[in-house]
Amino acid sequence: MVLNPRYQLDRRPLQGVPGDGWCGEKQMPDLIELNGRRYRKPQRPTVIICVDGCDPEYLDRGIPDGVFPTIGSFRRNGYFGRADAAMPTFTNPNNVSIVTGAPPSIHGIAGNYYLDRETGREVMMTDERLMLCETILALMAGAGIRTAAITAKDKLRKLLGRNLSGICFSSERASSEVEELVGRAKPDMYSADLSLFVLDAGIKLLERREGDLLYLSLSDYIQHAHAPGDPAADTFHRAIDDRVGRLVELGAVVGLVADHGMNDKALPDGAPNVIFLEDTLNKRFGADAVRVICPITDPFVRHHGALGSFVRVYASKAADLAALMAAGASIPGVALVLDGPEAARRFEMPVDREADFVVLGDANTAIGASRAEHDLSGLAGHRLRSHGGLGEQRVPFILSRPLTPEYRHLAETRRLRNFDIFDFALNGIR
């Protein structure tokens, strides 16, 4: 298949310091090595799917209701567990963690959005130059494995495609060649089909025998709008399950994880349950005492209005940091306040890119900056459902084939992370 160069990443030489430790990479006859882990080259087609926003409750309700016959069968025929996502529980840091097998402290991407302290500008974290290490995908492609990264959201394309010489494109901006491959026009960015298009593209690559290792990253449009058990959620998840079944029919090992869960963050009357933290702290401590950055911010504003349960707070030089943190912690709905170094240590985030302090909402509370900065009209009558905090850290961790005894023991005795999925899929199945 020939792809429009606009949707294929460059083929620059791999960068990094070879070695056995974090951020080193090696290539061996049947292995690659990255960030302290060795990965076997796939013995059969291997497909890792990040089901964006797939809170475990969708499976807990959907499997008994017959929504997930294929994925439900992995309880008997494969491995069916839970893992912890990286913090904060947003799309970019977790997708990059999954494809590097490492937390944000190693790869450098700790949000969708950050404040550049040197320039004072707020910046979208979509540039692969912000990444601090290579990806499993790039190293596998460099070792001769036919590798593809397909994402629903174009914001992830450059990050996932860092130094990747294989196929890399998004359904959001699919080229005419990709539309021809899949057999239909690219979907609307606010649709369930944005995700299904990704899965269908992956299926086509396997049917054509043009892929050995695929990473397929979906969109959480449906999960933001529809709770577990809602008809629209069930219809969407049945469609995902059908496509997972087809991948298995084609002989693939399938691994499924999520980048985060999802929780209702609305009041009983349906109004969003939001703390506008910048407004609150500046009212108490004076104008411009703080600047609040919402790292959930991305182009998909209709999903969440840039409201999640994790924010970064930058204090003015004249502000009393301890007093600001104490005031934030006293607000109902705030679950945790940590200074920047402690947040980086506890949540494995890069300390040099951290704020003065971070504030996390509880499972049912979103935190914003100022009311004027958040447009909630896109919710269009839906309850606010979002993510970012500790309440959305538990995610599915599923494999279509059973684990070896060694990896079964690991799964039972250590804390599983969503970014363990490539290790388990490539090294740990029977």
Label each region the model flagged.
Residues 4, 21, 99-227, 233, ...:
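His/Asp/Glu-rich, glycine-adjacent segments
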Residues 44, 51, 90, 114-127, ...:
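Secreted, luminal/periplasmic, and some membrane-associated catalytic domains
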Residues 60-101, 148:
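Short, structured active-site-proximal loop/turn typified by the sulfatase FGly-forming signature C/S-X-P-X-R
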Residues 24-79:
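Active-site-proximal N-terminal segment of extracellular/periplasmic enzymes that hydrolyze or transfer
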Residues 361-411, 415-423:
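Low-complexity, glycine/alanine/valine/leucine- and proline-rich hydrophobic stretches
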Residues 43-59, 74, 98, 140, ...:
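Beta-strand elements within well-structured catalytic alpha/beta cores of enzymes
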Residues 1, 18-19:
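A cross-taxon signal for low-complexity, glycine/charged-rich
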Residues 7-8, 15, 27:
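Low-complexity, intrinsically disordered or signal/transmembrane-proximal segments
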